[in-house]
């Protein structure tokens, strides 16, 4: 697997999660939503959060948009980005997402592992995201000091 695709994947994952922190803090203009959020995803995106619901792009966009400026203390740290497979024009990757003061999550300090599929394009497109909680013992061992 090429180093450049791994770097592109890592940067894209970190950039999207930085968007979340800034969006929920109200630090971005609302007019930036489509260019900084919606445009990152394939139109037929599938997102499965830890609770197991199946969301498409319209549903996910609505939830994120409605959360604007709702949680200024929210923080995310991305860890362990790993490219698992490259096939045709797609990449399968995993990463850990650690959240601090996530008011919409139970518990608000939490960790999850995500499996994602990207379409290799310019820019990369998120096609599929599946998150699951990290074990409670793992979550409890973190200091959440990011």
Predicted regions and their residues:
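Short, low-complexity N-terminal intrinsically disordered segments enriched in polar/charged residues
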Residues: 1-39, 43, 144-146
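A solvent-exposed, acidic/Ser-Thr-rich amphipathic alpha-helical stretch
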Residues: 31-89
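Generic short beta-strand segments
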Residues: 43-44, 94-101
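Short hydrophobic/aromatic-rich beta-strand segments that constitute the beta-sheet cores
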Residues: 47-48, 93, 128
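Hydrophobic/aromatic beta-strand elements that line small-molecule binding cavities or substrate pockets
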Residues: 64, 78-84, 96-99, 112-120, ...
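Short beta-strand edge/turn micro-motifs at domain boundaries
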Residues: 109-146
């Amino acid at each position: 697997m090429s180093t450049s695709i791994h770097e592109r994947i890592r940067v894209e994952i970190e950039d999207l999660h930085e968007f979340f922190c800034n969006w929920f803090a109200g630090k971005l203009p609302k007019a930036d939503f489509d260019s900084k959020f919606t445009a990152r995803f394939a139109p037929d995106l599938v997102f499965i959060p830890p609770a197991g619901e199946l969301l498409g792009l319209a549903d996910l966009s609505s939830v994120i948009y409605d959360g604007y400026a709702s949680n200024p203390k929210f923080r995310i740290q991305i860890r362990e980005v790993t490219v698992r497979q490259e096939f045709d024009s797609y990449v399968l990757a995993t990463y850990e997402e650690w959240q601090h003061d996530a008011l919409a999550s139970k518990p608000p300090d939490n960790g999850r592992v995500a499996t994602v599929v990207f379409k290799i394009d310019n820019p990369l497109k998120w096609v599929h995201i599946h998150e699951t909680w990290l074990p409670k013992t793992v979550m409890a061992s973190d200091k959440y000091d990011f």
